[in-house]
Swiss-Prot record:
Complex formation: Interacts with DnaB (DR_0549). Component of the replication restart primosome.
Keywords: ATP-binding, DNA replication, DNA-binding, Metal-binding, Nucleotide-binding, Primosome, Zinc
Lineage: Bacteria, Thermotogati, Deinococcota, Deinococci, Deinococcales
Record's cofactor remark: Binds 2 zinc ions per subunit.
InterPro entries named in the record: P-loop_NTPase (IPR027417), PriA (IPR005259), PriA_3primeBD (IPR041222), PriA_C (IPR041236), PriA_CRR (IPR040498), PriA_helicase (IPR050880)
Species this protein is from: Deinococcus radiodurans (strain ATCC 13939 / DSM 20539 / JCM 16871 / CCUG 27074 / LMG 4051 / NBRC 15346 / NCIMB 9279 / VKM B-1422 / R1)
Cofactor(s) needed: Zn(2+)
Biological role stated in the UniProt entry: Initiates the restart of stalled replication forks, which reloads the replicative helicase on sites other than the origin of replication. Recognizes abandoned replication forks and remodels them to uncover a helicase loading site. Promotes assembly of the primosome at these replication forks. Recognizes and binds DNA at stalled replication forks, also binds single-stranded (ss)DNA.
Superkingdom classification of source: Bacteria
Protein name: Probable replication restart protein PriA
Transmembrane region(s): none
Binding locations of Zn(2+) 1: 645, 648, 685, 688
Residues annotated for Zn(2+) 2 binding in this entry: 654, 657, 672, 675
Pfam families membership: PriA_3primeBD, PriA_C, Zn_ribbon_PriA
Gene3D superfamilies reported for this sequence: P-loop containing nucleotide triphosphate hydrolases (3.40.50.300)
Amino acid sequence: MTLWTVSPPAVSSEAEEKPVQDTVSLTAADQTWQVCVPLPIAALDFAAPHGYVGEVPLGCRVAVPWRGGEIRVGLVVGAGSSMGRHRLREALALLDSPEAPWVAPGTARGLTAWAEEAHLPPGLVWDDLLCTGWEPAHRHEVRAVPGADLSPYGETLPDTDWSRADLYPPALLDAAREQGLLDDRFLPDPPQVNRVVARDLNDVPPAARTQVVVTAQPWEAADPALCTPPHWEAVTGEGALTAKQQQAHDWLRAHGPQPSLGAWASGAKVGLPVVRKVADLGWAQEHPQAVPPPPAWKWLREHGPVASPAAWASAAGVRPAEVRRLMEGGAADYTFTPVTPPAAWAWLREHGPAETVSAWATGAGVSPSVAAGLLARGWAAQVQMPAPPPELPAAPLWAGPPLDELTALAADALPEEDRWRLHGGRPASRFAALAPRVARLLAQGRSVLILAPDHATLRRAWAGLGGLAALAGTRAALLSGQLSPRQREEIWRQVRAGDVRLVIGSALALSAPLPDLALLVVLEEGSDAYKLLSGSRAFVPDVAARVARSLRAALGLVGSVPAVESVPLPGLVLAPPRARVHVVDYAQPPAQPELGPLSSVHLTPGDLGYPISHDLARLLRQVQERGRQAALLAPRRGYSALLRCPRCDHVPGCPNCDVPLRFHQDRRQMECHQCGHHQSVPDRCDECGEQMWKARGPGTEWIAAEVEKLLPGFPVYRLDKDHQDDLAPLHAGEAGVVVGTQLLLAQPSPPNLALIGVTLADTWLGVSDFRASERYHRLLRQLAEWHPSRAPLLVVQTFQGDHPALKVLETGRDALAYPAAEERVRAELFYPPHARLAQIEVAARDRDRAKVAAQALADALHGAGAVATEVLGPAHAAVARVRGAYLYQLLLRARNDARLAELLGVLDTRSWGARVRVDVNPRST
């Protein structure tokens, strides 16, 4: 029974101000729970369910009342304040056992704490990062409290017996619930599936398992008129006979008994009245006489039963009338006989149940109509049964050293600190260095979680480390958004049960309830793919670090190159893979001979070739001549970044955003890559009327067209968000060139890859972001190690051939060289890791309104004590207008998290007249 007096749930201000507790232990009478629901709101305070005894069940799911009588599933993330408990609504029921919470309590604490530190509603973050459990398989039932009168609430309401809650209006149930007149319970209701099963033979309807046939009956038991018909015999009578009568009597005496008066008269050649008079005078009497069975009966006795009288007559070669006479006389009759069970039924008995009638038909080798007919006649039935566990990705086999070698202390060269890093080498060598640590922890009975930013990295990690679990006597699970909801639920069940202790997955795996988590590994921690593009816009490595700290688990950062923020950590740097780099420096053509034998001294900037330089063109021709493979990295999708009028330099732009429209030649469309607006290419310039357009900024479509002209007849493929050719021929080893965006790196490397070309590297540098050069360096490292064993020639076309991010790769420096240099620069300029950043975005449909609100926010920050170095801006965003909204930004820089929280607290002091959004640790500034 639930007892409360206030219907709408309210956010507790005390709970917002209170820090997350490490241990939560209150008596049931005092308990309030902080509950997150998957909505962009703060955690809500609810009283514990009526009669609940125990500690606050951190990480457990709970059913809570919601607006309009709706029931929602929430997650207990902390203890609320006991003040004002009597005003709170009670949670309806706890859906998980506190001994097996849906999320590890440490994860619940850590993730919620990170959301509060990031100035984000925890419900929004949980909605992004908890991939299953918000719609649990429970059946909600209600009943009236004994003695309660629910008639004032309506006619259709439950009585004192449990019944399904969905039979009643939710609002009426909620009204009765508020007054303590209703009991709720939630019973496990596992998913059901329809299956086709074979019925037991005795359960098959008699009409289906028997058939009506015509069967010969014993001849002696037939109607006497049929088997012993009366016959007329001559006897001595009294009285005189006429001559005709005497003739008839003499014939009968001579020829024996006759079956009828007619047969007698016919044989004696007299009329029927004559023989009848002889009989009347007593000179003939009727006596029964057995007759032999007719041929038709004998045939049926030997060959029967038959399906019908007509079939009998036809097979026996007699008239239907003869058959009717025998059946009417009881010499044959309809009988029921068991039929031979159909072969399809026997197959289903042995191999069933079948998922569908079609699957049954296919397995039994019959047509679907035959199977459907058997189902209709009752040989099979469609039933609901608990759904079987879904098939999960199979863990790969471990091909490395045995467990005893892996777990030897000498095999583990990684630091023992709480936070460490491992970078350099190729993916295989990094996994080989990580494997001893993972194997040792799994062998100790502890758990390991490995996060990957994208499907390509996830696929490599699963192949390289997934086999360690079986080696250590446990199981591994692959958890990502590519799995179905049922697969994710099954993995969650196995993890909660302790069957799985190694999880390798995407950001969705961060909240997996692994028992006794010892190590949380973040692969490629600097990858922008970890940044959620909507919702909370969380940067997953930041959340992972907070969760690892809350769980007291070690945090390992592993990748091709460390993020600059990771440089201060202790770690291991592997020797870099061999890289062959050739730079085409558009800015310094006379220096080209120094870069390699491919260039010529006479080249000028205009002669170098664009978007495919002469050097790259020569190499592509060699690829064609030798039947090899090449990959070209384009800076953008589509044909070009923009179209420009050659007369007045007018550039068609998006009507909703302050960006040029991208040109897609294959569709003859211009498209905005911010809002999706698209339109056809205008015939003339809107400004001057010029008919000619000039494309600027080559994309994948343009570069692919150039390659096709350069290499006629050679296979050319495209791979970007808009156009994805089938690369199966390349992966099978066939020659060709693929042109794509960074989506290429999500694919396995073609096996015979000989050349990689970066068509314009400056695109990654020409971004107003302090991380631009770091991204550029990471991209070059990833390209250099893309092939798992070979070192394809990497050709970089650029106007900045002496950029340090490129030079360290060209000169063979290790993976730490450039990030370490960048870290020293950031220390001087007060940027991460030596500062904490938060970007505040102010948006409004009116430009002046957005600008005024942004300035007011900056003034408030300065008024609260922020110094000039802590607040940069306001300034309009890099894209000043998106989807009709004008954007202004401020960048906050603080020395630590506490100071950043103080600055962000200013946002809560008033309303700003515009939409304000906070992005802590932004990935683009």
